[in-house]
Every structure is written in structure tokens, then in C-alpha cells.
Amino acid sequence: MAQTLYDKLWNTHVVHTEEDGTTLLYIDRQLLHEVTSPQAFEGLKIAQRPVWRISANLAVSDHNVPTTDRSHGIADPVSKLQVDTLDANCDAFGITQFKMNDVRQGIVHIIGPEQGATLPGMTIVCGDSHTSTHGAFGALAHGIGTSEVEHVLATQTLLQKKSKNMLVKVEGTLPRGCTAKDIVLAIIGKIGTAGGTGYAIEFGGSTIRALTMEGRMTVCNMAIEAGARAGMVAVDDTTIDYLKGRPFVPTGAEWNQAVEYWRQFKSDDGAQFDRVVELNAAEIVPQVTWGTSPEMVTSIDGRVPDPEREKDPVKRDAMERALAYMALEPNTPIESIKVDKIFIGSCTNARIEDIRAAAYVVKKLNRRVASNVRLAMVVPGSGLVKAQAEREGLDKVFTDAGFEWREPGCSMCLAMNADRLDPGERCASTSNRNFEGRQGAGGRTHLVSPAMAAAAAIEGHFVDIRQLG
């Protein structure tokens, strides 16, 4: 019987299934960070349990670490406690960790693939919503809660119920100026933030196949914003080429065996999906969110929608509340919206490809950050991304134009460190969530691609990067 990619990943990890469908799954890799792991480790200590499979875990501090000068450590006592606690727990249990001043440190969903700890055919979990990122490698990856983090540490298994299968098929050539971020925002705009609820989404079609691994990770990263449990892309040569030679990847004869095994992780011809959604890539334009949910998105050449035209009273109320919070009027052209701050970073868009795309726009415009922009910051996703960008001179492109070039971390995506918006400030952000207060109490977030964020920094408002040439 023909199987989907999700079916194969699920079936190869079943330990036991109850009559009601509840399944005990084996977990190949757990990624840990400082926010959702302390209680899990404490639970192990209280129960006097060891970590079942130490080598299956990899840890890094990312949420609370400062992105400015780290020579004096972490100033905030709560943030310092969380980071110090992860350090102590990893030392106590023997878990591999990239500490704050390790060049390999970075955002957990960037360092996993970067190190080759994310591999095709794996089940991967982390106490973090955007674990779906790793599905770009033909893996089953999703976020879990703190009690589940403890369960995986203790047993290397997890109780789950199987999701339904959804295929999101994007065909055609992506227009100039459009990126993976625009693809996934367009998908969420089409199906809504509840469109994927109860499903695992496979992203397929010629447009997805043409993406780099960085682009595929961006798309899978935001599967959770479409309501899905997981997002994934089939394994192909692009996947294999990206992984070869990375530190955690098999070598020699084991590499050849692994590649042969990995190539099975794609949907069979004739595999049945519970739902299929199709998009024409040629119709996608640069996207900008206008509200307080990723589904509240429109094209750069569009306008802020008018709630009065919405027939659904629930949606209309949500739109009215969002516009009030965002301080926007219906029918406002998106290009006329001015911004106060720029954030280029996050597990969605802080890889080297993203940094290059933003730097290209800055260099093309050949001007400094607009006078109305109070802060424009670039936060690489890892120390290795930062080092690569600096070797290419990209840091100087940004700093010469008035951007701040920072140390790696989650940063302004969720404002758990000192990087945040003040009340009323408007930000063009390459992150994944534009909820109320996400980037700081009263802050107003517009989600865009790195190129769009860079252009907004220079112009002081949103612009159509397709016009840049």
C-alpha cells in the first residue's frame, strides 16, 4: 500500500499502539534549551532517574542570551538563572551542550541542522513550538511540553495520536523578489491559522523542490502557524548535499548506508492525503502581515482590509480588534506604513541565505537606515552563521548602513532578553509570530522576508522589493 512521507516516519517509530490509537513513539533526537528544560531535569533528579540515551540529546541556550556584548555575562538575574541552570544540568547528566560563548551556540532550530544533528527519517522533539523546522529534512519534528521533555529524557519515547495527512502543493516558478517566507505566509493566508489543525503537512510541488534547505526550513518552521502538528519536505539530492560533511553526520561506509536509507523518506506515487491544497507560485507576491495573527496577511501592493466587508461576525470582530491594536485604518496602502524598528533574525530567517538576501538589498539601495527608524538590528542564527557572514563582509554592509550587528540568539522574536519593542513601536520583523505583545508589551509586529525588512529599514516604510531590480 502506498504511504505518505508522514506515514513512513510514523510507522518506522511505533513501539506500541493502544486500541484507541494512542501510540508510543520512539524519539531519535531531543533538542533542549534553557526555558522549557529546568523542570524536566528537576523531575529526573527527584525521581532519581538517569537520562535514558544521553547521545540522543543536544542542548543550547538561545532564548535568554544577550545579543550585545557578552564579556560581562548576563545582566538580568532571571535570564542568568535559566542559562546557568541548563549549563549545570547538562554537566550533571553528561549531555552535549553549546554554551553561550561557544562559536557553535545559536538558535536551537538553526544549530540542529547546521551540526547535522537533524537527519532524514528521524523523530525529533524539543520544548519549543517551532520544532517543525526540522521537518524540512524529511523528519517528523514537533514541539512538546515540559512534562514531555522529562518523559523523553527518561524513556526516549513519547505518547502520541496520529494526525491526518495534508499535502500543500506549490507549483511553478517563484517570481523575482519572492522568497520562502512569502510562500509560507501566502499558504497561511489561504488556509488560515486553523487550516492545518489535526494534520501533519507535507510541502511539495516544483516550487518547494526548487528551494534550498534554508528555504525549506523557513516554510516548515511556520507549519505550526497554520495549525499543523508538523511540517515536512521529502528527501532529495538537495537534502543529501546539505548534510554531507556536517559534524553529527555518519562518514565513510556508514554515510553510504545512511543515504540509501534516507532516500525512502518521500511519499509514494499514489499515496492518499486527507486534504490537498494547491498554490500557483506565479501568483505569490511579497507578503506583509497587517494584524495580530499570521493569517492576517496581504501583498505589498495591497491595502489594509476593511472589517465592514467581512461577513463572518467572529472574523470581523477579530479584524477590528487587530486594527485597533496595530493602530491601522482600513484601506491604508501597505506601502505607506512607516516602521520604527527592524528585526532581521529568528529561527525562521537567520540563516546565511537570509543574511545574504538582506545584505543584497542594503547594498543595492546604497543608503543608510532611514531617519525615522530608531533601531535596525541583524541577529545571526548561530555563531557559525555570524562567522560566515563576517568572512563574506556582510556585517560591514549592515554596519556601514547604520544597522546593528549582534550576537546569535532568539532576540526580539519573543522579547525574553533585552531586545524588545516599546509600547506603540512598529517593527518589520523576519520572525514567525505577530501576536499582541509578542515582541514587547504594546509592540506592533509586521512579518516579512529578510529582503523586505532590509528595504523597509532603508526607506523607513514598506516597499515593493520587486521594483528594486
From Swiss-Prot:
Task: From the UniProt record, give one GO term of the biological process aspect.
Answer: L-leucine biosynthetic process
> Cystine bridges: which residues?
none
- How is its cofactor bound, per UniProt? Binds 1 [4Fe-4S] cluster per subunit.
Q: Which Pfam families match?
A: Aconitase
One annotated GO molecular function is: 3-isopropylmalate dehydratase activity
EC class, as a word, reads: lyase
Q: What is this enzyme's EC?
A: 4.2.1.33
Q: Where does [4Fe-4S] cluster bind?
A: C347, C410, C413
Cofactor or coenzyme needed: [4Fe-4S] cluster
Which SUPFAM superfamilies does the entry link to?
Aconitase iron-sulfur domain
InterPro entries, A to Z: 3-IsopropMal_deHydase_lsu, Acnase/IPM_dHydase_lsu_aba_1/3, Acoase/IPM_deHydtase_lsu_aba, Aconitase_4Fe-4S_BS, Aconitase_4Fe-4S_dom, IPM_dehydratase_rel_enz, IPMI_cat
**What keyword terms does UniProt attach to this protein?**
4Fe-4S, Amino-acid biosynthesis, Branched-chain amino acid biosynthesis, Iron, Iron-sulfur, Leucine biosynthesis, Lyase, Metal-binding
Q: Which CDD domains match?
A: IPMI
- Reaction catalysed? (2R,3S)-3-isopropylmalate = (2S)-2-isopropylmalate
- Indicate whether Iron-sulfur appears among the record's keywords: yes
Q: Which domain of life is it from?
A: Bacteria
Q: Name its pathway.
A: Amino-acid biosynthesis; L-leucine biosynthesis; L-leucine from 3-methyl-2-oxobutanoate: step 2/4
What does the sequence similarity comment in the record state about its family?
Answer: Belongs to the aconitase/IPM isomerase family. LeuC type 1 subfamily.
- Subunit-structure text: Heterodimer of LeuC and LeuD.
Q: What does this protein do?
A: Catalyzes the isomerization between 2-isopropylmalate and 3-isopropylmalate, via the formation of 2-isopropylmaleate.
Instruction: Indicate what this protein is called per its UniProt record.
Output: 3-isopropylmalate dehydratase large subunit
Name of the coding gene: leuC
